[in-house]
Amino acid sequence: MNDMAKPLPTPPTAEIRKSRSNSPKKAQKTNLSPNKNQNNEKNVPRSNGRTKNEHNSMDDEEFEFFHQFSREKVKGVIHVITAELKEKGPDVEFLMIPFRPEQTNDKLLTLLNQLFPLGNGQPVNEKKQLRIVSKADVWTLFQCLKYIWCRLPNSEIIGWKSYLEFKFREEDKKFPRKSFLEIMPQCLASPNHASIVYDFFDLIISISSNSRVNKMSARKISKMCAIWAFSKQIPNSDIQDYDFESAAMKSFAPNNSIQDGLDQWIPASDAMFHLLLAFLRSFVPQDLESAKLPRTLKSLLFNNQYPPRKSTAYTSETILTIPLVTLKTDVFSRKPWQLLERCNDLLDFSDHDAFEAREDYALLKSLFRKKNTVEGISRKMSQESRRLMKAMSTKHSTFQPGWAPRECIENISHLKECIEVKRLDIDDYFIWTWLSSLSFEQTSEKKKIFGRSIILEFEFDGFKKWVVFQECDITLDYNKKGQLKKKTSAQSPTTEKELPPDDFELEDPPLSKSPTLSQTYKKFQAEVPQQSTVRRDSAPDNQGIYHTVISKNALTKNKHNVNLHSFEHKISKWNPLNNLRKKSGSNSSSSSFEEKSKDAPIREEYHTNKNHKSKKEERVLSQFSTLNPDEYQLPVIETGSSNFKIEIPELMYEHDDDDSDKLKNSQKRATDSAIEELNGMVEEMMINEPDDVKISITEAETFESLTKFDQYKPSNITDDDLQSSHSSAVHSLKLSTNTNDSCADSSKYTADRKLAEPRKISEESKVNDDSSSYYSPNINNLPASRMPSQPTYSNSDSKKAFTNESRLNVLQGAVSPSQQVTPKPYKNAPGDCVSPVQQKYYQNDRRNEMSPASAPVPPSAYSPARSPQFSTNSAGFKQNTINVPVGYNDPAHVLANQPHMTYRDQHNYPSHQQKQRPFQNNIVPPELKSRNQRADASPIPQHMVPVKQGVPNLPSNVPLYQQMERMNPNHQHPVNTYKVTQPPYHNNTTNAYGNSRAGNAHMLDGKWSNNPPQMVPKGVRPNQYPQQHVNRYSPQAQPVVPAEYYNGPPPMRAPPMMSHMVPAQEPIRYTAGANRRSFPQGMQQNAYSVPAQPMGAVNSEFYLPEAPQGNKLHGNINKRQERKKLYDNIRSGNFGI
């Protein structure tokens, strides 16, 4: 033992190591640990930024198997592990994500001891490596690979010098297709280095080739792996950090916050993405037909320009804005739980201005409701977050995850401890990267990349919210801000250097055979120069070439949510003035200050410029504000004046101060000819009739384009909450209320959208009838009091107006925006869900309509629109049916108009989605129970109406559009022959949010606290009662989709019918054609003579079969007269504008 106590210049003997290998903790506590450390410090260069004292303090607290590996020794081990992972890993879900239950310290330590039995980085021979690796599981193998990666020389796999030299040489040679295989080896230090780099990208491509199974795309995992590919040594570092011990200026001190970590990692992620595309291009042949890459990798090549000119970190549609709580202190917390306790004590909710968003205030206040305790916070965490906190807080005997040990700088300025709440933009793979940096096998240097931050997930009534907590050195933060101010004041304000546009065009590269050929692997190593000293004379010149494409202002953590930028840009697409700007060539467009690259086929609807953000956080910008007639008015254009200007209030988005100068300069650069052209276009826009404007946003926007990444999609928003809801993972506080802000305002929002002809919209609706979804309120649910554009009816008045005017909207192709409201076409597939903002506690006025809340809209002749609004029933029942004339009690006619099963037959909806949602409110008068049960018992009544009864009696004075719709063969469908026992497909929402309260399209859990009640007759099972009307009669033709359903509510100035023509209400089996109540081809409308029934009976007689009654001749004559009169008014241009 005395010999062992001496410093050994060589590794210990095999016998000594064998006795120590099985007890690493014991060896650490004895005098062997200093010997090992002295040996390593003697032979291995100290890692950057570490003093000797820092090494000793860390060795006292951290277990380390081996500090640093040489490339020559571990090249073979990395290659063997990579080959095994390529074979077994692609089918494993989330293989590269740390903190998995399958990963344990014991397994990792056992594998490391087997591969490196001497403990000095010298592996066993190749045969033993193959045998050891083949017996290990993939989780431990990848953990072992990460352990070796972060302990390579300079703690990096590739290195900034190699990348910058590759970038310079590739540009010099005009970006050859095989640039990675031909140029990259010349930029690496040795063949061993080339072997490791090749295996690195080979593993990334192999894992991401099966991303549909393992949920890891090439773009995300390549950027995540940047923390191992590049160390902190970023050229031209703007801000010098302070050393924590001596307060001397050092360039490589640990990062002080998660923002500093993003500043370091995002440029590295962009470099990794560049190299990944170069690696893929090297295996793509010229012949497209011979491409054998998976579709995911093909799309990666075809949808990204090469080389990437700008950062792609914030170009994803899944960017999420979350609260960032920062504790600035001079004493760091020992564990994350202690940080939460300190935040709990310091957060002051009386100061509302301290929170940038109302959602942040509500979320944090609900978290820290009880002071001086973290039990409530722990209960609100998700299961994964609790597991992560437990792993980081538990003391492990070997490898310890979590924050690296660190001390604060002495607070010589006596700065007071404080807390602040900001906002942070992240993506899902940002969290993956943060997790990877804190994993068990990482070094202290990697654990310091994102400072002392913790990203936690909380659950609130089914919602899942992310919050970032971190603590910063208050002295370091103060000094860095002072240095930044000095730097910015000393330097003249210069914009970032942009790479000059290249002449080459991005080819759509054909795709390749598998890049895992040993021939290519050997050739890649052979390309490395024989001398280890690679030419580095171009490195100083490269320093000017490399630039961080994420600007400093873009990373000041005050950015708005990128999703809001994208949404505002899409709104500007249909704005006529935005189109005028594009035609005139002016640079004053508020959506972007830079021209979108023409050779970039992706991100057509997205601009990465940060200028969309609003500087006034307290002012809520609404997407509907530009459509509000009170706020948006065209200015008076004086063309004769010399200083002609157009000032449009509330149109330009607000910008930061530094961007306002650019806006002014761009406006000054507009030429006189462009202004004249703009003047002419504005006049032309004012002269043109509204029906000339054929604008559709169905193709520009889908529901997925407005939501966040799948696990944490925000809810639909209200007008008042637009800015914060779209820019945050935290949802509006109004989710549980019964207000209709979003719905009411969306009527204004969609008022100007669709004034196209019905036939043109039919083509778009057929094309766009896919499984995607878009937020659109269930407008039928709105109370009449919340609709400014529509008068409030009582129940009787609504019947008059509806029966008289509901059929006239086909004639009104061009009405004012205040009269015609057309939401976007619904594109929900069966089972798609809507937000609880739309699902209120009141029922639909149209009971079983084909609304996006319940069923998909089949391809039809028109795009869907809103239906007239009616007040709720005063008798205590919610209005569940469409308003129908008196005596219109014949279910046979209703069924003849709307054969639900025929719809399902045509559109092939899967049967497993035809589930009826269980209803909660069984509100049926007791006297009707027996009638409902009898109706169940006899699903096929005896009252059969002849189908072709009224063919010869078609009135000749029926308007042409009705005759065409009746006789149009496109609307004829085969006779329904389905069995009655088949459930109708349109009741397919299990709980309106997915399958059995799961799979919500907006939130991960799919659980909402405000599930809307449904009504079903007592004694009838949920899947049973709609079947009474499925096959009562066999219709010969299918009616067209009602005009008012697609063209919006009828104008309210049309005179109501006479009182004797007002029919009573009767529930209608409503599908896509229920509002019109048109009859199948050849069936004449029969009038009825039964007196009107009270409103209570209307709701009570729910799907009860009745016999046909009489003929409704007077009503038909009067309606035709009213139609003709209104048609004449419209033709003469007198339609209320």
From Swiss-Prot:
Positions carrying Phosphoserine: S538, S776, S816
Region feature Disordered, mapped onto this chain: 1-59, 483-520, 577-620, 736-799, 814-871
Listed InterPro entries: Msb1/Mug8, Msb1/Mug8_dom
Comp. bias intervals (Polar residues): 21-50, 736-749, 770-796
Keyword Plastid applies: no
Keywords associated with the record: Phosphoprotein
Pfam families according to UniProt: Msb1-Mug8_dom (PF08101)
PANTHER family: MORPHOGENESIS-RELATED PROTEIN MSB1
Protein name per UniProt: Morphogenesis-related protein MSB1
Species this protein is from: Saccharomyces cerevisiae (strain ATCC 204508 / S288c) (Baker's yeast)
